[in-house]
Amino acid sequence: MVEKIIHFSDLHIKLYKDHKQYKDILCRCFKEWSDLEPDRIVFTGDLVHSKNQMTPELINMVTWVLSQCSKICPTIILIGNHDFLENNLDRVDALSPIINTMGNPDIMYFKNSGVEEDENINWIVYSLMDHNKRPDFTPDPAKINIGLFHGPIQGLVTDMGFAFEDGYNTNEFRGCDLVLAGDIHKHQVLGIPNNKKAYMVGSLIQQNFGENVRKHGYGVYNIKNDEYKFIEVDNRSPYLNFKIKDITDIENGKEKLTNF
């Protein structure tokens, strides 16, 4: 029976840059996750950054991440918009060849929309391969119906203050007991029908200067208590934005950090 879920998203692994920094952070996460003894790890999209551009370094990094997760517990991967070419579905996505070659039964790649049965859970998969069309499903009252989603949702905002007024309609999540989501890199919680919640976990690691240093990490969902806890991850090499009037602010130590 699945009782505890680790939720993370939006790694955006680059072709060859920043892999050492990512490994340092991920190794600490893997240790924490192993200690938490989860039953499932769920990644909600954008494992890679450059869509279908690949390098040997990227393949090695993706394989390592998936292998380490699967050693902790069975791991579920959702496709993100950076993992394939949305405007050309005839092209193979970046993750399928890697996951297929690995042949690891503890890595479950939910690429297409639908309902995936998994012990006491029905995973309700909203897939970008089908333009996030609502899956045809009837909620099973005997199971926990968990939506998996990657994309902007109405009511979300970015660290820069942009609001997604035309994002995905939360009514499309009706029937879900909760939704685990990725895509927007700022951690947020949204209400969905029937007084349930959608958790946009945010990116595990700060991606650029347009994002705040803090509030990047992963979520832990306890099914028994219906409790979702966000855990912030320490980044020892952050992108820092400073505001100064002139060079004397730096000389006098009066520069102001604006994206903490």
Regions found by a protein language model. Give the residues of each.
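Conserved catalytic scaffold of divalent metal-dependent phosphoesterases
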Residues: 83-171, 201
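Hydrophobic anchor at the start of a short beta-strand
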Residues: 75, 145, 228
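Core catalytic region of metal-dependent phosphoesterases/phosphodiesterases
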Residues: 2, 11, 15-115, 172, ...
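Active-site glycine-centered loops adjacent to acidic/histidine catalytic or metal-binding residues
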Residues: 10, 45-46, 80-81, 150, ...
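Conserved beta-strand elements of the Class I
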Residues: 6, 122-124, 219, 238
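Conserved beta-sheet core of the metallophosphoesterase superfamily
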Residues: 159-225
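Structural motif
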Residues: 3-5, 39-40, 121-122, 144-146, ...
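Binuclear metal-dependent phosphoesterase catalytic core
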Residues: 116, 198-260
